[in-house]
UniProtKB/Swiss-Prot annotation:
It is a multi-pass membrane protein. InterPro entries: NADH_UbQ_OxRdtase_su1/FPO, NADH_UbQ_OxRdtase_su1_CS. NDH is composed of at least 16 different subunits, 5 of which are encoded in the nucleus. It catalyses: a plastoquinone + NADH + (n+1) H(+)(in) = a plastoquinol + NAD(+) + n H(+)(out); a plastoquinone + NADPH + (n+1) H(+)(in) = a plastoquinol + NADP(+) + n H(+)(out). It comes from Lactuca sativa. This is NAD(P)H-quinone oxidoreductase subunit 1, chloroplastic. Belongs to the complex I subunit 1 family.
Length: 363
């Protein structure tokens, strides 16, 4: 039997070509993910620097100034220091829960970025249930905190984990009801559709004006979800040393630190998407994609402009949670639970009822 070498070479080259296509496909699939992770990392470093500078301004003192120009590398220096610190394990604790807890907290928050549109259709997962997927994923983080508190075998850590779980449950429900009201107004649960529904009238089309009560409830609930003052009871220094973080050191403590700022950034991004018009300009009847959709370069430029607008709104909004840290006193645990269950929950239910009635009347 004679084998044609030309056919063999053609088959081999075809198989090599197919395998190269698969490799390129995997690479192109990973590039957006790595780009998003890099962008999120830079975003967190910027938030840390902003918080230190704004806090210094509020307290009339000098902020970080030695690590890089204007102290912009101070957060990077702190992170590097944590990387090289010793990783201690509690002698009588549950080491598996102790080690898994920080990872669950960080991963659940990172997954929330999948449904955030940074510009026109610049989103990793444009799902029809995008906002509710974010709520479902973010509710996993307190499980990691509770595991960390329990695995530490420390009464302060365990109390901090219990507080984190109770606080998350109390404020998750009003937050969900506010998101449901926005979903009813936009006739969609997709984050992209919600932004596009606010694009027609520019600044006046923002859901902030159509849902002022919902915006205030969402703001308070998101601050509680991020455990920012006045809702930082899970890690109250005067009561619980450092809460569920008490026994942690090194990179694991750094993961909690990163998770806190990741959660703050994702909450601010969702405020921008749900209430502040997302990537759109604040000029009536001017929709960013339609302005730059003429050429390929125009599309790229429009995408960059959309990213810039989204981030500008997000970082401007971040001034509110940073300022409240040095303005409002910490609540007691009973006050926190009463605020969530007896005040915010009825208000968010009433807001949802009003939104539903207005939508039914407009049919």
């Amino acid at each position: 039997m004679i084998i044609d070498t030309t056919e063999v070479q053609a088959i081999n080259s075809f198989s090599i070509l197919e395998s190269l296509k698969e490799v390129y496909g995997i690479i192109w699939m990973l590039i957006p993910i790595f780009t998003l992770v890099l962008g999120i990392t830079i975003g967190v470093l910027v938030i840390v620097w902003l918080e230190r500078e704004i806090s210094a301004g509020i307290q009339q003192r000098i902020g970080p100034e030695y690590a890089g120009p204007l102290g912009i590398l101070q957060a990077l220096a702190d992170g590097t220091k944590l990387l090289f610190k010793e990783n201690l394990l509690p002698s009588r604790g549950d080491t598996r829960l102790f080690s898994i807890g920080p990872s669950i907290a960080v991963i659940s928050i990172l997954l929330s970025y999948l449904v955030i549109p940074f510009s026109y259709h610049l989103v990793l997962a444009d799902l029809s249930i995008g906002v509710f997927l974010w709520i479902a994923i973010s509710s996993i983080a307190p499980v990691g905190l509770l595991m960390s508190g329990y695995g530490s075998n420390n009464k302060y850590s365990f109390l901090g984990g219990l507080r984190a779980a109770a606080q998350s449950i109390s404020y998750e429900i009003p937050l969900t009801l506010c998101v449901l009201s926005i979903s009813l107004l936009s006739n969609s649960s997709s984050t992209v559709d919600i932004v596009e529904a606010q694009s027609k009238y520019g600044f006046w089309g923002w859901n902030l004006w159509r849902q002022p009560i919902g915006f205030l409830v969402f703001l308070i609930s998101s601050l509680a979800e991020c455990e920012r003052l006045p809702f930082d009871l899970p890690e109250a220094e005067e009561e619980l040393v450092a809460g569920y973080q008490t026994e942690y050191s090194g990179i694991k403590f750094g993961l909690f630190y990163v998770a806190s700022y990741l959660n703050l950034l994702v909450s601010s991004l969702f405020v921008t998407v749900l209430y502040l018009g997302g990537w759109n300009l604040s000029i009536p009847y001017i929709f960013v994609p339609e302005v730059f959709e003429i050429t390929k370069r125009g599309r790229v430029f429009g995408t960059i402009i959309g990213i810039f607008i989204t981030l500008a709104k997000t970082y401007l909004f971040l001034f509110i949670p940073i300022a409240t840290r040095w303005t409002l006193p910490r609540l007691r645990m009973d006050q926190l639970l009463n605020l969530g269950w007896k005040f915010l929950l009825p208000i968010s239910l009433g807001n949802l009822l009003l939104t539903t009635c207005s939508q039914l009347i407009s049919l």
